[in-house]
């Protein structure tokens, strides 16, 4: 089965047709999924003098597709012929009339790509960086398949805190620092400003393992966490798995034999009653154990399987 590819770093206004057209140059696509950005209304009932890092009264509620959000509107540029005097223009702005709708964002910043065959997947993964709509994007194996087969240790934790507008390093260290020493907190930004996720680096990879089993809430919002793994680490883990599979093919299981095992042990009609003397029994090495005590061979060739047994 061809692996699914996770693409991140897409522009907010990139369309599904653009993403599909770009990746079709590597091979025939089976699937192209471009999730739309989530749309929320923000309600803040707290006092204005309260610090934003300590606010707990901010609520986020999803809106209908037909509703228009504040960040999807822009003020019309002042035009004397259209708006008259500047005072009338400002009055219209106050009444909510002098606004125009901006193009709605079509992308949440990531996509899932699946090719029909492995050739398209291999061609796409040859390059770490791809450019779509003048935005540099990264591609990697999708998480669900990557975690099932590979166990890659990492001290870095990916944290998405959407729909919160922003978080501080102090808040993150306060909530995540209880699980291990934090050495660095890196906030990610693009040309439009800071994004809603960051990378937390711990001193020990075991801290990341523990956090992946926990549910962390900040300001009543559940943090989305995943292991931040470099592509080089994934390749090393895949190489180790291939080496292990190759060793398993070469290594024979215990008591391996090329002969059929008889339904009952081979016994000798000349079995000796003396159990103290042990002699080499080639049939035991061929999978015929357990055997009763056998007398020594008179023909040395029969011990190596070149002649008939004497019993």
Swiss-Prot record:
<dbReference type="GO" id="GO:0071013">
    <property type="term" value="C:catalytic step 2 spliceosome"/>
</dbReference>
<dbReference type="GO" id="GO:0000398">
    <property type="term" value="P:mRNA splicing, via spliceosome"/>
</dbReference>
<feature type="compositionally biased region" description="Polar residues">
    <location>
        <begin position="261"/>
        <end position="270"/>
    </location>
</feature>
<keyword id="KW-0694">RNA-binding</keyword>
<protein>
    <recommendedName>
        <fullName>Putative RNA-binding protein R05D3.8</fullName>
    </recommendedName>
</protein>
<dbReference type="GO" id="GO:0003723">
    <property type="term" value="F:RNA binding"/>
</dbReference>
<dbReference type="Pfam" id="PF00076">
    <property type="entry name" value="RRM_1"/>
</dbReference>
<dbReference type="InterPro" id="IPR000504">
    <property type="entry name" value="RRM_dom"/>
</dbReference>
<feature type="domain" description="RRM">
    <location>
        <begin position="155"/>
        <end position="235"/>
    </location>
</feature>
<dbReference type="InterPro" id="IPR035979">
    <property type="entry name" value="RBD_domain_sf"/>
</dbReference>
<feature type="region of interest" description="Disordered">
    <location>
        <begin position="261"/>
        <end position="311"/>
    </location>
</feature>
<dbReference type="InterPro" id="IPR012677">
    <property type="entry name" value="Nucleotide-bd_a/b_plait_sf"/>
</dbReference>
């Amino acid at each position: 089965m061809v692996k699914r590819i996770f693409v991140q770093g897409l522009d907010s206004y990139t369309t599904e047709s653009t993403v599909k057209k770009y990746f079709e140059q590597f091979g025939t696509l089976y699937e192209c999924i471009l999730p739309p950005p989530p749309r929320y209304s923000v309600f803040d009932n707290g006092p204005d003098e309260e610090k934003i890092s300590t606010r707990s009264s901010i609520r986020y509620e999803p809106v209908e597709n037909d509703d228009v959000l504040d960040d999807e509107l822009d003020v019309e540029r002042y035009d004397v012929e259209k708006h008259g005097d500047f005072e009338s223009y400002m009055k219209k702005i106050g009444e909510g009339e002098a606004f125009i709708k901006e193009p709605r964002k079509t992308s949440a910043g990531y996509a899932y790509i699946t090719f029909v065959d492995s050739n398209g997947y291999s061609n796409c993964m040859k390059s770490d960086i791809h450019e779509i709509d003048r935005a540099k994007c990264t591609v990697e194996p999708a998480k669900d398949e990557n975690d099932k087969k590979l166990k890659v240790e990492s001290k870095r934790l990916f944290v998405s805190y959407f729909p919160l507008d922003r978080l501080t390093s102090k808040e993150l260290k306060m909530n995540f620092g209880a699980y291990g020493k934090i050495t660095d907190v890196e906030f990610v930004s693009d040309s439009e400003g800071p994004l809603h996720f960051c990378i937390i680096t711990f001193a020990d990879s075991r801290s990341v393992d523990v956090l992946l089993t926990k549910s962390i809430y900040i300001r009543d919002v559940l943090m989305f966490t995943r292991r931040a793994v470099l592509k080089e680490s994934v390749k090393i883990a895949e190489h180790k798995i291939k080496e292990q599979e190759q060793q398993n093919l070469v290594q024979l299981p215990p008591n391996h034999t090329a002969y059929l095992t008889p339904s009952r042990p081979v016994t000798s009609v000349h079995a000796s009653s003396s159990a103290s003397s042990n002699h080499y029994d080639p049939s035991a090495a061929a999978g015929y154990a357990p055997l009763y005590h056998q007398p020594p061979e008179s023909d040395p060739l029969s011990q190596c399987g070149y002649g008939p047994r004497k019993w």
